[in-house]
Amino acid sequence: MSNTSIRLKSCPVLISNFINKMKSCIMSCAFIGVSDIPQPDNQTDRKFFGDVAKARIGGVEVILLKPSTLMNLSGKAVAAVSAFYKITPSEILVAHDELDLLPGTARLKIGGGSAGHNGLKSIVSCLGSSDFVRLRIGIGHPRDRQLQIPVADYVLSRPPKEDQELISSAIKKALSCIDEIVEGDFSRAMSILNEKNDPRK
């Protein structure tokens, strides 16, 4: 991923499925550790379909959004905040769970497809663009464990303790380079995320 001078104005949009009701499920992994990001003036606003807060990260004032919608309707919240604060897709960071990455792994990506992720599909549809930045938190795929269960059941299940620890570690590493991410220094952020090899390989 090449470096860029784009600074993010919305960081992070965290998408999951009724987080307060499903704190122990795999899908909720992207929310773990969000309390470590300063969130002054937190407010719930119906027109934003979620909790919104302003914060300063890495010298940049950003908007934090935690949608309260179903995960597959997350785009409604993202589009509402984007329109109200005049934020372009390239200035948005979405943190989400990633089946195609093993637990303990976090990666950055600019644009691209949804890879079957219903939350991303909704955001792309509502924004009319896929050019936002993604912070992908690995949760693994059921096939990694030779589990014969549907993906939908897997992401709603309780992760094993080992995976919980790996996911938590990946999120902490992501938070350690949040300044670089927000300021647009993606090359440096990726270097930090890649410092340690995938613990499951």
What residue spans do the PLM features occupy?
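Nucleotide and nucleotide-moiety/phosphate-recognizing core
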Residues: 1-111, 121-136, 142-153, 157, ...
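Conserved TIR/SEFIR loop-to-helix hotspot centered on a Trp-containing motif
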Residues: 114
